[in-house]
């Protein structure tokens, strides 16, 4: 059985780390963290790695997702941080965008349902990056799928995920933007249904409240969680986090 993952989140907007709340990107402010007095991505990632002993990071390049200039040079700097693994959602729209990231040495490339134009983008990524480096983010708002992909636009999460799995996807992220930054806590019944249905790895982002939440997801055989707000506001105790990450 694969190790349960706890992955810190870095949301980048205007080339600095921001505090994401409810997917309302026009209201995002620079991150204020108890861990580091900076909103500079390399500083924050380095500090988080050192204090949590977690060597993996999830990056959402919101500049790219919002169809602005992607943070290519910043990504290159982040990848020079010693012993760091990067999962990034850079707002992939078309298959041709995948090649822009295939040579970076990423741990995984994330395809968000919110941005991809069609399902063939997923198939192309599986071919280019391989199944172990391809992650599909099931982007939702209050459990309604966010997407422009015609085949799944009016479908529920369970039907959508079934289609995604049939393409050969082995890892998904359940990401409800409404829950982001709110520390709502608990496991939604929908997520438990997804866990029963989907045979691959499931990461969960948005709404993680505390260590107890993390332990619950681990107990229910999810593959990992993405943590942001509860880490940076001090709710998650570092000693307990390090302990659960080791076990």
Regions found by a protein language model. Name each.
Residues 69-76, 150-159, 184-192:
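Charged helix-capping and loop-helix junction motifs
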Residues 36-50, 94-99, 152-163, 214:
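Short, acidic/polar
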Residues 81, 86-108, 190-224:
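Catalytic cores of alpha/beta
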Residues 50-104, 188:
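N-terminal active-site wall of soluble small-molecule enzyme domains
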Residues 8, 12-32, 102, 106-180:
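Conserved anion-binding
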Residues 5-12, 57-59, 86-90, 109-111, ...:
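Hydrophobic faces of well-ordered beta-strands that scaffold small-molecule active sites
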Residues 21-63:
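N-terminal beta-alpha supersecondary unit
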């Amino acid at each position: 059985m694969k190790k349960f993952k706890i992955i810190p989140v870095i949301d980048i907007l205007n080339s600095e780390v921001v505090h994401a709340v409810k997917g309302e990107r026009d209201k995002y402010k620079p991150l204020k963290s108890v861990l580091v007095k900076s909103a500079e991505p390399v500083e924050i990632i380095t500090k988080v790695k050192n204090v949590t002993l977690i060597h993996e990071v999830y990056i959402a390049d919101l500049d790219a997702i919002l169809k602005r200039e992607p943070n290519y040079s910043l990504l290159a700097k982040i990848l020079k941080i010693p012993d760091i693994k990067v999962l990034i959602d850079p707002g992939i729209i078309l298959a041709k965008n995948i090649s822009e990231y295939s040579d970076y040495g990423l741990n995984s490339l994330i395809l968000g349902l919110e941005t991809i134009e069609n399902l063939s983008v997923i198939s192309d990524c599986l071919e280019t990056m391989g199944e172990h480096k391809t992650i599909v983010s099931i982007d939702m708002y209050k459990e309604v799928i966010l997407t422009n992909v015609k085949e799944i636009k009016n479908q529920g999460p369970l039907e959508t995920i079934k289609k995604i799995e049939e393409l050969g996807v082995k890892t998904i992220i359940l990401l409800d933007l409404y829950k982001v930054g709110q520390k709502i806590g608990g496991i939604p019944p929908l997520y438990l249904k997804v866990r029963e249905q989907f045979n691959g790895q499931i990461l969960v982002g948005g709404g993680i409240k505390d260590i107890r939440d993390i332990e619950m997801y681990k107990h229910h055989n999810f593959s990992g969680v993405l943590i942001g707000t509860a880490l940076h506001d001090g709710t998650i105790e570092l000693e307990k986090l390090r302990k659960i990450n080791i076990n």
